[in-house]
Amino acid sequence: MLDKYSPAEIESKHYQNWESQGYFRPDMDLTKPSFSIQLPPPNVTGTLHMGHAFNQTIMDGLTRYYRMKGCNTAWIPGTDHAGIATQIVVERQLAAQNVSRHDLGREKFLEKVWEWKEVSGGTITQQMRRVGCSADWTREYFTMDGVRAETVTEVFVRLYEQGLIYRGKRLVNWDPVLGTAVSDLEVESMEEQGSMWHIRYPLADNPTEAVIVATTRPETLLGDAAVAVNPEDERYTHLIGKELILPLTGRTIPVIADEYVEKDFGTGCVKITPAHDFNDYEVGKRHDTRLINVFDLEAKVLANAEVFNFKGEAQPGFSLPEKYAGLDRFAARKQMVADLQEQGFLVEIKPHTLMTPKGDRTGSVIEPMLTSQWFVAMSATPNGGEPDNEFKGLSLADKAKKAVDSGAVRFIPENWVNTYNQWMNNIQDWCISRQLWWGHQIPAWYDEAGNVYVARNQAEAEKQAGKTGLTREEDVLDTWFSSALVPFSTLGWPSETDELKAFLPSNVLVTGYEIIFFWVARMIMMTTHFTGKVPFKAVYIHGIVRDHEGKKMSKSEGNVIDPVDLIDGIGLDKLLMKRTTGLRKPETAPKVEEATKKLFPEGIPSMGADALRFTMASYASLGRSVNFDFKRAEGYRNFCNKIWNATNFVLMNTENQDCGYGATAAEPRGHSFPDMWIIGRLNQTIEQVTQAYETYRFDLAAETLYSFVWNDYCDWYLELAKVQLQTGCASRQRATRHTLLRVLEAALRLLHPIIPFITEELWQTVAPMCDAKTADSIMLARFPETDGGEIVQTAFGQMTVLQDLIGAVRNLRGETGIQPNVKAPLFVESADDLADYLKYLPMMTRLTEARQVAALPESGDAPVAVCNGARLMLKVEIDKAAETARLSKEAEKLQKALDKLNAKLSKPGYTEKAPAHLVEKDKADLAELEDKMAKVQNQLAKLKD
């Protein structure tokens, strides 16, 4: 007998043992097929969220499956230094002590960051262990550790020497609060209600005539370089090439023609400010306008405009109106709008809905800013220094395109190839510099004249310069730069290691679609460029985990479910505290609290890691999003309990019994058709589950396993086994025990990749009883293989007959309202001999006996059913009046429910306006009620006959 199922107890016990025994490490036998997978490195600042739990369940499931298939298996874990995120956390801690990073200086500040990383950095990897991740922790890396730092420097220097890294003036996303450039991924577009200002720009040669320019950003007017109109817009063709007076400045700017301008948007005249708008930058580049920067790095108006050409060369500047100098951009907007109105330039202000770019860390409005940055050239051809391979001589972008076009890297689902190619065909040079302190400091040094020397260290730079006293570049690299090198920086490159031979390319990358461009594409570029190999053979793109209503999970919205809370459980009070702290809108706290109480009235009970993993596996379809339903997790907790209880039943009936193993393995075993059926179903399940794992369809694997274990094994075979163990001969009983153990042990191995803890615990007891303990751990045991010879169709046919008979008797009992505790005799009239089937019916359908007769006895009231040509009669007296009353009451209740639901669905506009999933549920409920009503009406009709 097993103790009560306690997930917490078995999880801690087994994980500790797996890790200490070294089971997660590859054996590095290069004669064996390899399976490797890279963990998308989570931020070192992070804690586990549902997205992590989702993709880590898939990754761990694959790793465990291929390990059991005998592969040399490596799942390589690591964490990302997360430049901006980490620096913000530490700066906030210092701010609480009234200290800034500038007070400390760079060196002391970085010491503080490393201290914080050592204390807090391991949280997420410990939580990964809680989920059961069988990663090789001996290979764990940090993207700023010594090995990775050397690789980053080597890659940077080589790219620079190949002409693929350069420094130049470019427009970037600038966060004025952080004081750094940020990537597109770190910018959120927020819909806001704003204004559209219509401003007069007078003609220089005729100030009484003017064009009306519509803009949402009047504060950038000081940096205007032109006004653009559509060349096909007849209203303005006569003005193309003319000069306009720029309001508030007295400067003149030209009217230019560009198809970028939409004739029907606003007034059809657009101010072009190339130094403060990405679209304007492209227009300005086409027309070779000036780049006029009017803001400093804090987004305050400069006293003197900085002017450049599109080669990044400084041009003569000019002074800006003195009254705006030093004003924050939004204060400047307010003042300038007032001045425009006062001077007669403001025509009107219209309300306008716009998308405002905001920094995801600070919430500040992102400013397109012209700054000196380091870039990786995406479309330039390297000038040598590449390894000799099929990708040699191609630009980084073309390498990444070829890898996918050739099929060397495939996307799952395939439709993501279109998204990938669309981005690759519109790729821009990659801005890799960040104005931060935490990160890989760019390996470049400057002399007093501003000459740059890129080198692996200062001594090498000084050798290049032929002098000392050089100054190191202060900027650090974009976090994605070091992340892009992970496929080979974790395997010993630039040395030719066994790890590189065995594990590059890895088999699959499991990730979300939001970082296809920022990480996936760049890994393909860097890996093909430096190794001549692709980083991975497949990219499995999974959906985003959302809440049960399909909303994005966000701490600021109060709808986050912490995976660890699902594993361990959490009381309502603590859950409410977690969900109402840090809300974006604190005033929504009562609403969040109400929703939480409704969803989790008693908090979240402990589910255990296995139930969480099975839930995640069941959601791993090829869709774009996953609506997480807590009820499903509860259902899979029950499934784990079902497996535990089924094992208990098997042990109770096999321990210290003759099971046909060991000493009695050669003794005859009289397999019944239920034995042959469940063995056949096991083999079918092995085939289906293997196919599902191989094609990354964990949802199908979970569905198949659930159906086999719960329905076939527990609900059918265990119940039939009870009959065989009570009534069968010694040979039949031996065969039944043999089958009980054999099928259970194989099922545990099939389940192990998804639910590793409970399967390990049970396998350690079950496997020795059926001579299947071939390894110290289930994770090292072989994955089951199909034996087609054991799929016996006659047994399947016999089982169908038995299931039909049992179903018919159960329906007969239900239709006539026979109480579960009432036993009755069953008489069966059939031309076929049904003796092999009838012996199972008394226990399975609560009968006193099941007897085959030449003809059914005379009985006017006894219920009769027909099943596959056989006539079945339950010999039981029925109180017609009482049964009619019961069914009539049931029909009345069903009719009320039907009327209510029909009224809801026929309400004008309901099916069009209500959420689709609610409408579908209502329609499904209606169909179910109609089916029940039809059955009740049928039973009433029979009683009247």
Curated annotation (Swiss-Prot):
CDD domains reported in the protein's UniProt record: Anticodon_Ia_Val, ValRS_core
EC number per UniProt: 6.1.1.9
Broad class of the protein's primary localization: cytoplasm
Annotated motif 'HIGH' region, positions: 42-52
An example molecular function term from Gene Ontology annotations: ATP binding
Motif ('KMSKS' region): 552-556
SUPFAM superfamilies: Anticodon-binding domain of a subclass of class I aminoacyl-tRNA synthetases, Nucleotidylyl transferase, tRNA-binding arm, ValRS/IleRS/LeuRS editing domain
Subcellular location: Cytoplasm
Matching Gene3D superfamilies: HUPs, Isoleucyl-tRNA Synthetase, Domain 1, Valyl-tRNA synthetase, C-terminal domain
UniProt KW keywords: Aminoacyl-tRNA synthetase, ATP-binding, Coiled coil, Cytoplasm, Ligase, Nucleotide-binding, Protein biosynthesis
Entry annotated with the keyword RNA-binding: no
Residues forming coiled coils: 879-945
One GO process term, biological-process aspect: valyl-tRNA aminoacylation
UniProt-listed InterPro entries: aa-tRNA-synth_I_CS (IPR001412), aa-tRNA-synth_Ia (IPR002300), Anticodon_Ia_Val (IPR033705), M/V/L/I-tRNA-synth_anticd-bd (IPR013155), Rossmann-like_a/b/a_fold (IPR014729), tRNA-bd_arm (IPR010978), tRNAsynth_Ia_anticodon-bd (IPR009080), Val-tRNA_synth_C_sf (IPR037118)
Transmembrane region(s): none
Keyword Acetylation: no
Swiss-Prot/TrEMBL domain comment: ValRS has two distinct active sites: one for aminoacylation and one for editing. The misactivated threonine is translocated from the active site to the editing site. The C-terminal coiled-coil domain is crucial for aminoacylation activity.
Family: Belongs to the class-I aminoacyl-tRNA synthetase family. ValS type 1 subfamily.
Role according to the record: Catalyzes the attachment of valine to tRNA(Val). As ValRS can inadvertently accommodate and process structurally similar amino acids such as threonine, to avoid such errors, it has a 'posttransfer' editing activity that hydrolyzes mischarged Thr-tRNA(Val) in a tRNA-dependent manner.
Identification of the protein by name: Valine--tRNA ligase
Gene that specifies this protein: valS
